[in-house]
Amino acid sequence: MSSKKQSFFVIFVSLFFLFSLLEINKANRSVFVTPSPPSSIVSGGYWELLQSSIGISAMHVQLLPNNKVIIFDRTDFGPSNLSLPYGTYCPGNDCTAHSVLYDVDSNTFRPLRLVTDTFCSSGSLDHDGILIQTGGFSQGDHLIRTFTPCDSFDDCDWNELNQSRLVDRRWYATNHVLPDGRIIILGGRRVFTYEFYPKDDFLNNNKSIYLQFLVETRDPDENNLYPFLHLLPDGNLFIFANKNSILFDYKRSIVLKQFPLIPGDDKRNYPSTGSSILLPLRLSSTGPLVVEVLVCGGAPSGAFLKADTMKIYVEASRTCGRLRVNDQDPQWLMEFMPIPRVMPDMVLLPTGDVIIINGAANGTAGWEDAVNPVLNPVLYSVNEEPDRRFTVLSPSKIPRLYHSVAMLLPEGRILVGGSNPHTSYVFTGLYPTELSLEAYNPYYLDPKFNSIRPSIVSVESGSSVLYGQRFGIAFSLSLYKQGAAFAALMSPPFTTHSFGMNQRMVVLKTASVVQLTMFEYKLLVYGPTNGNVAPPGYYMLFVVHSGIPSHGVWLKVT
């Protein structure tokens, strides 16, 4: 073939490919952002090992409003590496613990006693800060368990509610706190319903309600377990499963809107596990509230079958989809991560940005179904230009694969733990069971920022605030910059299987900032508008100044 013919052929193929892409995306008009050159690894941020072993692998975690973290695994695999205290009743002759209570402030832990199996379960904090933990496997799949925080580190333990059971089994389900304080429990393996806790005959919520969307999103690999669930400021739910998403009125059981399919071939829910968050809700006196959902990672169609039956590990998803759900005509903005990732955890930072952490570059969730751990977290800068949002951060030395977790702590660190891609505890081979806890310290904790780091002195409303209440937050710092401070509420999510249930950030409306002394100021703000914006319960309150957050203090919203 002559060079002219070769050139014509290349141009023809290129144009054909371009027009094919345009035709594919014409229907949903989604936008794909061309990525900028990969960011270099930044020196900011560092890792620290907190505990080389807590005796169990962290499959589920929940931060409590007394700076304790409840961590638990499953009970059906045999003994763990942590014994129950002498004299404790041993369920099934297993005298080892499958749950611990970790004290953030003292970096200590103690064993807790679980009776029924919590394997792949779900949970939420109620409005009083009590963990309502639901479902699991086998004899635990209909169970409701509670954990009530207590002042003494040694006096709390699990309580199983034998008189109150779930209507349907809940294994791989998702929970969310609602504006009235109830909790919705949605989905699960081969369960296409939702229900509420607590049960109430008067409200007629003592039964489960069928949801066709859960049937429609199930494929041969399932790919709709642990559906992503976000409460929106209009009081409705955003539900995402597989590649599909809807706006759902749970009170009337009506689908109000079907959003466009997220573009591409990647599936986003278990076992092709991605993650999702509701981006920060910024309350202000000007302009409408912007409501956006971010979905990142996952695996291509068919990836689970290849990994699980043939041990062929295809590359994970490289894309994130961002959807402004309250637009008149919502369309996905697709962005390319610098590293492919399945089983990512997504953690909202007090700055309003997102850390994407944990997971693998090939394979899916499941028993020994992933390889090539992704050791580098990635910072997603929410307000940067679309092609400049990702920054690769310093790596951990510890792979965190299937059944690993990550969540924000009040001082701004990220607690990271777990990883057990095996059916039991295995401490040999390529990716052994991981019992350690570590923390990733983001760049903003560097001492060089101490002069502009705010420190909360007091909260005018005390330990609680009413909806819409105006209140003051006194804070101190050395170098104050006018107009550079805001206050934000961060909810403590229940985290498992790469999804932080109830994860939420609300930037409070600012009235004014008043200088009290040379180095002390008062930020006057308004409490959240209502329970749609911030469901009742405990939040971490942060003051952020020039992009540097204070340590968080606990505030109850009622």
Regions found by a protein language model. Give the residues of each.
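Ser/Thr/Pro- and often Gln-rich low-complexity regulatory segments
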Residues: 2-558
